[in-house]
């Protein structure tokens, strides 16, 4: 989502549904106060750990996806605060062929946050390099935000693996506890 200026509301909902099985994705509130809420459809493609890179260039529809991932605790946002364009706009073509963009609603993140003009603060804030990186260096070791996202993803995976190792349903753990219960000793090593 980093440096993604946005797109269509419906597209951002569809993309979010790839990662959010259930739960609110976004709510829109019209100028008349009518609120419409869009949710996951139970057909997420994956439950695997997720880290999303964001920055001040992440706006509008990309903020819908980022907000849905963050508020649903589906993944971590890494980078800089997003742009803060929490508006739904419609393009009208005029008779002379020119266009007019009209704001038709504002949107709220799943937690009800209006991010217009304030943006979304990432879970892990990482400023970019003082000297801009080259296009070919994006997503490489020279990209500080990418490295921070990679590190966080590894941490998430390691935490999940540690938790599953000590799952009470794990028969090896149950056998270990039974043996050590008799000795009244429990090793943390």
Residue spans for each PLM region:
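Gly/Ser/Thr-rich loop/hinge elements
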Residues: 5-60, 87-92, 108
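Extracytoplasmic/secreted envelope proteins and their assembly/folding machinery
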Residues: 9-16, 47-50, 62-66, 70, ...
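Short catalytic/ligand-gating loop segments at beta-alpha or beta-beta junctions
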Residues: 32-33, 78-88, 166-167
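Flexible glycine-/small-residue-rich
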Residues: 54, 104-106, 128
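Short, well-structured beta-strand/strand-turn elements
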Residues: 57-59, 72-85
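Short acidic, Pro/Gly- and aromatic-enriched capping/linker segments at domain boundaries
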Residues: 96, 101-105
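Conserved functional hotspot residues or short segments at active or partner-binding sites
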Residues: 113-189
């Amino acid at each position: 989502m980093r440096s993604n200026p946005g797109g269509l509301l419906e597209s951002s909902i569809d993309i979010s549904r790839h990662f959010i099985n259930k739960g609110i994705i976004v709510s829109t509130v019209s100028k008349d106060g009518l609120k419409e809420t869009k949710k996951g459809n139970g057909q997420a493609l994956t439950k695997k750990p997720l880290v999303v890179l964001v920055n001040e260039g992440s706006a509008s529809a990309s903020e819908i996806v980022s907000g849905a991932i963050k508020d649903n605790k589906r993944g971590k946002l890494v980078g800089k605060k997003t742009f803060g364009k929490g508006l739904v706009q419609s393009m009208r073509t005029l008779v002379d062929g020119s266009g007019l963009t009209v704001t038709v609603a504002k949107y709220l993140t799943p937690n009800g946050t209006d991010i217009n003009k304030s943006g979304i603060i990432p879970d892990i804030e990482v400023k970019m390099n003082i000297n801009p990186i080259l296009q070919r260096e994006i997503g490489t070791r020279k990209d500080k935000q990418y490295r921070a996202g990679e590190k966080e993803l590894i941490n998430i995976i390691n935490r999940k693996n540690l938790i599953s190792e000590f799952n009470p349903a794990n028969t090896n753990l149950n056998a270990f506890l039974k043996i050590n219960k008799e000795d009244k000793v429990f090793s943390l090593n």
